[in-house]
A protein has these predicted regions:
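Long, low-hydrophobicity, acidic/polar, solvent-exposed interaction domains
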Residues: 36-201
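GHKL (Bergerat-fold) ATPase N-terminal catalytic module, capturing the glycine-rich phosphate-binding loop
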Residues: 2-3, 66
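Hydrophobic single transmembrane helices highlighted by the model
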Residues: 3-40
Length: 201
């Protein structure tokens, strides 16, 4: 006598709830994550025990690479546009609407004013390659760094200044940046550092 065959039943799992959770999580991370700006150079900040959080808005960030080149960034596009216009007036440099648009969407800037129009005409990939070898002048004969800070403050009085320098940046360069800020009576600023681990303390 043959054995009765048991019919195989197909399993059906309703994945609707799982897909809903996935979409919710994805939306949550997209809305709560902060945009990390692309920087022209890689900077390894020195370690410290300070846990003060830098504000995410109204920030003027000053980036100093190991070679002492200075770059800057503003977090608001209207501020970027207004500051560029003021710098153009101060240095007698005119910008086309296309050049202005390229500037305000850039995450970081750092070329001398006389080179700025030609720089902004370049494709983004070429700009990235050139920018890391430039830097904002900050010497006694041509301190454009001070002009950028002064005009940024004129555009947005609520700006917070943050300096992000590499651990191997020469102290003389940082001192020059700080002296320039003091000349403008900008005596309040944050130094961006990485948090020391327990083994480093």
């Amino acid at each position: 006598m043959g054995r009765a065959k048991i019919k195989k039943k197909s399993m059906f799992i309703d994945m609707t709830a799982m897909s809903d959770v996935t979409v919710l999580l994805l939306t949550f991370f997209m809305l709560t994550s902060t945009f990390v700006k692309k920087e022209p150079v890689e900077v390894f900040t020195p370690a410290s025990v300070s846990e003060i959080k830098i504000p995410e808005t109204n920030i003027l960030q000053i980036l100093v690479d190991p070679a002492g080149k200075i770059f800057m960034s503003l977090d608001k596009q209207p501020d970027m546009k207004a500051v560029l216009e003021k710098m153009g007036e101060e240095y007698g440099v005119k910008f086309t609407p296309e050049q202005e648009q390229k500037f305000i969407v850039a995450s970081t800037f750092g070329v001398p004013m006389k080179s700025m129009p030609k720089f902004l005409d370049l494709p983004t990939e070429k700009q990235d390659r050139i920018l890391k070898n430039e830097g904002i002048p900050c010497d006694s004969t041509d301190n454009q760094f001070k002009s950028w800070v002064r005009n940024a403050r004129a555009v947005n009085s609520d700006l917070r200044i943050a300096i992000k320098a590499d651990a191997n940046t020469p102290y003389a360069v940082i001192k020059k940046v700080m002296n320039s800020l003091q000349d403008l009576r900008e005596n309040r600023y944050n130094l961006i550092t990485s948090l020391k681990t327990t083994s480093e303390k």
